[in-house]
Amino acid sequence: MNTQQLAKLRSIVPEMRRVRHIHFVGIGGAGMGGIAEVLANEGYQISGSDLAPNPVTQQLMNLGATIYFNHRPENVRDASVVVVSSAISADNPEIVAAHEARIPVIRRAEMLAELMRFRHGIAIAGTHGKTTTTAMVSSIYAEAGLDPTFVNGGLVKAAGVHARLGHGRYLIAEADESDASFLHLQPMVAIVTNIEADHMDTYQGDFENLKQTFINFLHNLPFYGRAVMCVDDPVIRELLPRVGRQTTTYGFSEDADVRVEDYQQIGPQGHFTLLRQDKEPMRVTLNAPGRHNALNAAAAVAVATEEGIDDEAILRALESFQGTGRRFDFLGEFPLEPVNGKSGTAMLVDDYGHHPTEVDATIKAARAGWPDKNLVMLFQPHRFTRTRDLYDDFANVLTQVDTLLMLEVYPAGEAPIPGADSRSLCRTIRGRGKIDPILVPDPAQVAEMLAPVLTGNDLILVQGAGNIGKIARSLAEIKLKPQTPEEEQHD
């Protein structure tokens, strides 16, 4: 660490100058890797462990981090602090070794809180839309020349990274409610996009507990801070009287402080007007499809307007917005002649949405932008508990596509639950009589089973949060064409 870097550390986080070496367990996750990247750029010695390399670990290695693709006690040797992902169990050998060596073990959000402590923090929370809204706020602040630091849960495509260290006073961060760790954060501004029943194991299956946790998060704001909340969401509307902080509401609702109206989608772009109190109407072109993204943009505009950012900078940022990785991510349009002998093409879109509300929003955006397309979805349910808890909602939403192919549930470490598997879900959907789902038992069969259902005027949505993103990229690489054994062997 050189003198200039050390001086910068002392100016930003005075007490953390005592920390030199920070070790991350589960460093390959987007949220963990983003914080590690910011700290690496601040001059800290970074090490970390994960089970397999990925683009996040490669980026960190490029910055000089030491990455171990195993979990061993010796990996934490000489660390000043160990940061742990919520996905890591307490009996992990590195965690055990850290405790034995009296090395502090903290959660990701605690380290994020330290980064935020001496900056103007803007935290984006909510069940859906956090990642995209974080990217929108970051893009606006960057366009305005404010050079923010950002830490996002997904790839910010314009920057090519999940996180970036800026020289300005702002830190814009996605706040994760999945393990309630966002309660460690003490931002100046907090956005809450919506609140639905998800990650209920964290909240003992009690939705009231989840709602109160969001209130507690907002009460971490100073009395002069501001909560920016989507009034279209019925739970948020219910909670507003309990928020003891200054609030700005946004939404399509007539009583919203920042109101979206005249929404129209043309292809991948949304066009709408934003009405703000004591401001001229703002006519927005947003380079992201769907009414849900208009709401995300309204949240970002509400924050930027409160900060006094120029309207022209806001509009430029939204019109040129490049989106985030795996959020309605266009991977290409491919001719079908080599795939199944038909004329025409198929568009391929990759999307991370894995909750029924998110899947519904993606389908609606696809229908609005490309109403004449044959809509084909390849869906991978994520977690048996989520499939069980939201079973009927999934069955209702998934009947809206023209053709549905379904992979087995991605377990994310969970044990199977009878009746919450993909075969059962396909059977239920089939029984409703609208579509006949196709179960794909082996991911290696996706291209082979997809090809016959394509018509030549298709939009393929590859949907889910497990390893299905890799399948989407693989489909793009082979241009949807099923591979012969010889071609697979060559690959």
UniProtKB/Swiss-Prot annotation:
Annotated catalysed reactions: UDP-N-acetyl-alpha-D-muramate + L-alanine + ATP = UDP-N-acetyl-alpha-D-muramoyl-L-alanine + ADP + phosphate + H(+)
Record-listed ATP binding positions: G126, T127, H128, G129, K130, T131, T132
Entries under Pfam families matching the protein: Mur_ligase, Mur_ligase_C, Mur_ligase_M
Gene Ontology molecular-function annotations: ATP binding; UDP-N-acetylmuramate-L-alanine ligase activity
Superkingdom as given in the UniProt entry: Bacteria
This protein's record includes keyword Cell division: yes
GO BP, sorted A to Z: cell division; cell wall organization; peptidoglycan biosynthetic process; regulation of cell shape
Keywords: ATP-binding, Cell cycle, Cell division, Cell shape, Cell wall biogenesis/degradation, Cytoplasm, Ligase, Nucleotide-binding, Peptidoglycan synthesis
InterPro entries in the record: Mur-like_cat_sf, Mur_ligase_C, Mur_ligase_C_dom_sf, Mur_ligase_cen, Mur_ligase_N, MurCDEF_pg_biosynth, UDP-N-AcMur_Ala_ligase_MurC
Localisation: Cytoplasm
Record EC number: 6.3.2.8
Top-tier EC class: ligase
Pathway: Cell wall biogenesis; peptidoglycan biosynthesis
Family label: Belongs to the MurCDEF family.
Function: Cell wall formation.
Name this protein carries in UniProt: UDP-N-acetylmuramate--L-alanine ligase
UniProt source species: Escherichia coli O139:H28 (strain E24377A / ETEC)
